[in-house]
């Protein structure tokens, strides 16, 4: 038997090695941070087996004659490069190395090789390797698939601990990565060094790069574009690469792609920004204005001008990057991590040699950002660069936040130059809306009429307070278009009703199918005939709806194509590719526009025929409806002409307010003057003082006015001035001052008007309030606004202010002694009442009220009318039980005589009806005398006492039969309560 050939020098069989301490410990993801990778990192493993199972790394001994084939032997040797430790790698590179054994284990491989490292690198989320390959023009998904296919082709090991040994090729790759680290002058081995190491990997990397046409030069170019001029000086450099791309948004790139909305107007503000940016130092404008006036739009307008070349030489071909402070702060777990990110951003900006301009929206968030546990905040990091002119930065913030944050830091404030952005006028807003119309039409797939744009600007300015143009007008147009789009895509009402009817008849037909009687068969035949008609109509309507929808969809797709062609034309003109621009403009664009005109004409003809089920144009009625939903104003008030509605105001008020003709007339005329546009738009709609004795209808007139103007009595904000008798109680109206309890809650008056700006404000018993309370009313009545305790301006320009007072009521009650109720007597009494008011209220307060209205005391006949009104309310309360109340004229007269008291007005009537009518009705219902759907007659009855006293009159309640009820209602003797 021949002797076995000797093993290669320096190698020991695994059986012999088993006698010595094992040095190849398993290593994997669970390796301790900071510790050596494992002892096996100092060794490389060779698998010796017959048949070439070890691949390139295996050494196959020659066959031995007359002996059994040798078993597979694991042979180890010491690596010459020492230990692999975490300290020499960046965190991302170390993570990929540590997770490689796990990849090998999943694939049932004992030796960790370069292909496992490649898969680990490509599977890192937001990993640097993926970014490098993407920059080099390689599809990462295809690269990962090729790697996995190579791994699957490798032989698998069963029964042993897989993934426990470091392969020779992987060790060589790590050594090459160390060499690239020295070449780049870095302090740590990073992911890019590992990626470059694959280029010389004979096992796997070289062939992979050849298949995907990846060269070392293309990789180095990609790495340089990502790294810039940075060196790896810490263990997290990957987070600082492309910091601007990661934490910012390139507005100039978006402008080139046509993704920014057009900016209309604002030329002065943009020119001022350009002027400040062109300075040598402190070249940092900050845009200050109210929220919604268009500060961010100015930065976008500047980006568009840079792209178009409409800027001075100092700003030509510059990049405008919008910094995302949220992304910058998010995920910064460790102390100093946020500062590292911000420094990386600032370094990229300064390294660009003025080619990059930073835009920080909501710049007040920079002050104090990241300043936790003694760390330096972002504002202090910006200051040196801002002052020296190394960093050009545009900021944007609101007036309040600028004062609260920026002005508190004078060193930061002086580095910024203020550019105030005012709210545009209504005319400018209409121009802005016209410029944006095409974008919103394209997005929603509807048309927006010019009248809708004008209505959006006018109605938002008039009715939506607390927000600013053009933002609130744009929101109106956007929401109206979205509502119309939703209606187009939803099933039309006519079709939906037919669908429901078909389902109902189908269910009825199924239930009648098994019935054999003649009536059921007749009903079944009628249902089938009706179903056939309905289904035919359903089919026609569905086809019509689908046809209209398809035409609208086609129009939208043509518009999108036109928009894309326009962007391409602009890009071609910027690149001076005039042939391409002319070809697009006079070829593709013309063809698309002709196609659009033809399709729109087809749709218009169809809609004008009256058969259309869909509406595809936003009108001013749609805008008005959205305004009503935002503010609570009834939509009919805006859509219906005020002239038509207000002409009947006096008649409507008289349905609820009995008598008081001068008061009702004065209120109606004041409202008509206001709505006709003859009153001051900077003052309340109207302000009245109702003076008169108690119970004559002062508060009722206010409620009736609210029900007519706003369709609900809830629109009355009632404030009882007897609660404001102390001097300090004025703070309850407009809010407590800072430092006092209730400061955050706001005032009772100001909060009510802010929540519901269109209401009637009723100050009841005004003379009972403290004199200092009237000082608040001066600016409300004169300027239509008041500033609350938190500095917010509350507008009263759309409110009706009514004050009631009992001053001089003694003169009104003595009116009969003065000569009855003639006009001359009324004027005389009114003069006396006004004199009494002047003795109570100060002249500057009285001079601001639009009209003083003196209420007359109620007469006996008017009390009867009030009795009928109160009985109608009783009938309303029992209407849900379907009980009808019939009241005779005698009963009305009886109740009126009991409720008449000149000193107390109409209030006793309510008590009388409660005592004589409601109580008796309640007892009758509880006894069972009156049941649901009964008709009850209320009449009077005279009783003669037997003791010789005078006859007495009382109310009696009779249950009427079904036959007598209609006759009694028609008889003149009886009056229905309603």
UniProtKB/Swiss-Prot annotation:
GO terms for biological process: cellular response to heat; protein refolding. Gene3D superfamilies: 1.10.8.60, Clp, N-terminal domain, P-loop containing nucleotide triphosphate hydrolases. Residues 1-76 form a transit peptide. One of its GO terms (cellular component) is chloroplast. The keyword Transit peptide applies. Coiled coil: none annotated. ATP binds at residues 289-296, 692-699. It comes from the Eukaryota. Keywords: ATP-binding, Chaperone, Chloroplast, Nucleotide-binding, Plastid, Repeat, Transit peptide. Induction: By heat and oxidative stresses. It is found in: Plastid, Chloroplast. Belongs to the ClpA/ClpB family. Molecular chaperone that may play a role in chloroplast development. This is Chaperone protein ClpB2, chloroplastic. It comes from Oryza sativa subsp. japonica. The gene is CLPB2.
